[in-house]
């Protein structure tokens, strides 16, 4: 995250210095006066779980840890201008994600390591309030915050696992999001690199009686996304 912020600020500063020195023309001068505009988003996500184990963890369970994995996002941007420095953004997104839960189990003879993989296909609807700085030449910084509804189309909550002992999680979630980015005004469109982090509100664990689920008291989503919007 620190590298992303440093790089973005460096690019913005370099752009402004170049513009001041060479008198670069202002791109899209009336862009921010539009009441609404559209675009698309591509990005990568990194998700894992915040895990809280039960207080009386069974003797056969030594360790439970979450391992973050990378995924892909594709979305459609709808941006509504509220006033000069505030926008409302709605970005329906298809998100392909994967998470792993690592267990160390004791069978009275050996310690066994097990990875339980959870693959998800999310339909996400984030609604964010975007606050923009003043525009400097062809760039401006912004921060945003909001909530996101997430529906997992690949949820295995209600399926019969046929003895495979998969970790089942609930199908939907609500998350809090906060992020930052920079708008770059190019000759024909606006390009914006953006970093967001999110935290789930719901406990997603489904206790089906297996050792993998009954050892977990709470399972909440957390992660971050690096995305690029073209508007």
Regions found by a protein language model. Give the residues of each.
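Repeated loop/turn-to-beta-strand initiation elements of outer-membrane beta-barrel proteins
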Residues: 48, 85-88, 137, 188-191
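Flexible, solvent-exposed loop segments that connect beta-strands
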Residues: 52-66, 98-120, 153-169, 205-217
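Residues that define the transmembrane beta-barrel architecture of outer-membrane proteins
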Residues: 34-36, 68-72, 119-123, 139, ...
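Predominantly the C-terminal beta-signal and adjacent terminal strand-loop region
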Residues: 171-173, 181-231
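Outer-membrane beta-barrel strand-turn architecture
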Residues: 32, 80-84, 133-137, 184-186, ...
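Transmembrane beta-strands of outer-membrane beta-barrel proteins
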Residues: 36-42, 88-92, 123-125, 141-147, ...
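Transmembrane beta-strands of outer-membrane beta-barrel pores
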Residues: 44-48, 94-98, 133, 147-153, ...
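Short glycine/proline- and aromatic-enriched beta-strand/turn motifs that initiate or cap beta-hairpins
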Residues: 20-70, 231
